[in-house]
Amino acid sequence: MRVNNLTPQDLKAYGINDVQDIVYNPSYDTLYQEELNPGLEGYERGVLTNLGAVAVDTGIFTGRSPKDKYIVRDDTTRDTLWWSDKGKGKNDNKPLSQETWQHLKDLVTHQLSGKRLFVVDAFCGANADTRLSVRFITEVAWQAHFVKNMFIRPTDEELVNFKPDFIVMNGAKCTNPQWKEQGLNSENFVAFNLTERIQLIGGTWYGGEMKKGMFSVMNYLLPLKGIASMHCSANVGEKGDVAVFFGLSGTGKTTLSTDPKRRLIGDDEHGWDDDGVFNFEGGCYAKTIKLSKEAEPEIYHAIRRDALLENVTVREDGTVDFDDGSKTENTRVSYPIYHIDNIVKPVSKAGHATKVIFLTADAFGVLPPVSRLTANQTQYHFLSGFTAKLAGTERGVTEPTPTFSACFGAAFLSLHPTQYAEVLVKRMQAAGAQAYLVNTGWNGTGKRISIKDTRAIIDAILNGSLDNAETFRLPLFDLAIPTELPGVDTRILDPRNTYASPEQWQEKATALAKLFIENFEKYTDTPAGEALVTAGPKL
């Protein structure tokens, strides 16, 4: 459907020449036929599963490649961006020269020239005042399918005068042979130019680079306008009460916000402005490893026609083995948000959040399943962003390792972490919001805290019973822990009880406390950061 009659001439403006044909904003039926075309080879080819969803493989790139991320350093970004080569903070915002950018752009536009291309126009951001109009250009049908699922699909009327604010050119099939001379990490690249407002992708087929690329852009633009930009899921209760769930990949954002008792706003990326919380996306990107119909029925039932599975094992009879992590632990599915029945309609936005939940998967088994945070502890734990990096969401990670990721999303932050903390705190104070730290990870038994217990904890937060519960303080971390909660095994609330002896917990807790203190040193170069030290662990 060529609503705005995009022509090869239009693509010439981006340096893409001699385009054979443009498949503009293809329907799901068109994408289905394109992906299953028997003439396709390699990673372009989709496989039909018995659930109705198409499955694709993304090759060796089964997660993002943060070491291959670059941003052009110019007058727009020089003094605003959080650069990897400045300050104490560790991040992936490596500077790129204008010359190298032009070389990468030439590679991608050459790759896309002379081809039959898929062009998808979509929105990033459910708030019309601040959303980005994004044009995605790719030669691969399933990549067009991915962005159609994940971003907000414009109406026919909105497409008539669609003018892109940002262009994403995906040249997954091309690589950069001159990477060594240019001082880059590898032949693959995910590069941004915030002056030209273009993202380039080369070498990696992973769909998540397009999703998280736009998240990085929103993370640059919104906080500068005083709008919180958050790596979180969000939902709303029957009384209009909004909760947001911060957390890194695999900590439970999608699972815990997909709740039959509450309507989903979104599962991963949100803004918080003067009107309330709004989704950046039009879809969900759920992990499927060990997915079961019983434990996560909403996500399981969302995997049907128009959903797109990534890197799962499909048996000869078309059934999916969700337990098989042989390709990667980071198996995924993208689906349009309306595949979940219980969502906020027609626009994925709601009022101001009153509950802010920080999800962590503690591989040490030290932190309690839930604690109520003071205002200073809220800032401390937001800036710390502690979790265990779970297997598979980045290449080369197979065992859980502790990690600190500022604002529970350092990989996607374009500004200094304190800028996100300042905006979030202002929004929380204005809304009278309360924060909680929820450990969805392990305890002294060596087992992961069950989804059943975690869901009961979330229920207690959302219905207010946790705020009324009697609490005690956990030593070292000074966290307020409830003595009992409805539906939760009381023995697990105090993590010390899950160890053979309190000394075992003390030993592990001391080791983790040291890591927290070392990590937070990077924020102590400002008076505001120094003031927060007392909100962290004390040895």
From Swiss-Prot:
Entries under InterPro entries matching the protein: PEP_carboxykinase_ATP (IPR001272), PEP_carboxykinase_C (IPR013035), PEP_carboxykinase_N (IPR008210), PEPCK_ATP_CS (IPR015994)
Domain of life: Bacteria
Binding-site residues, substrate: R64, Y206, K212, R332
Annotated binding of ATP, by residue: 212, 231, 247-255, 296, 332, 448-449, 454
A cellular component term, taken from the record's GO annotations: cytosol
Enzyme class, spelled out: lyase
GO molecular function: ATP binding; metal ion binding; phosphoenolpyruvate carboxykinase (ATP) activity
Sites where the protein binds Mn(2+): K212, H231, D268
GO biological process terms, semicolon-separated: gluconeogenesis
Known EC number: 4.1.1.49
Pathway: Carbohydrate biosynthesis; gluconeogenesis
PROSITE patterns: PEPCK_ATP
Entry note: cofactor: Binds 1 Mn(2+) ion per subunit.
Keywords assigned: ATP-binding, Cytoplasm, Decarboxylase, Gluconeogenesis, Lyase, Manganese, Metal-binding, Nucleotide-binding
Statement: the UniProt record of this protein carries the keyword Cell wall biogenesis/degradation: no
Record note on quaternary structure: Monomer.
Cross-referenced HAMAP family: PEPCK_ATP
The name this protein goes by in its record: Phosphoenolpyruvate carboxykinase (ATP)
